[in-house]
Amino acid sequence: ALWKNMLKGIGKLAGQAALGAVKTLVGAES
C-alpha cells in the first residue's frame, strides 16, 4: 500500500537524521 511506502521513507529519513545528530554530538565532544 502507498502509506506503507511512505512510512518506510519517513523511517529512513528519521534514521538518517538520528545518525547525523549522533555523529554531530560525538564530533563536538571529541
UniProtKB/Swiss-Prot annotation:
Q: In which tissues is it expressed?
A: Expressed by the skin glands.
Respond yes or no to whether keyword Ubl conjugation is given for this record. Answer: no
- What are the UniProt keywords, alphabetically? Amphibian defense peptide, Antibiotic, Antimicrobial, Secreted
Q: Which GO terms describe its cellular component?
A: extracellular region
User: What InterPro entries does this protein's entry cite?
Assistant: Dermaseptin_dom
Name the source's superkingdom. Answer: Eukaryota
Keyword match Transferase: no
Protein name per the record = Dermaseptin-DI4
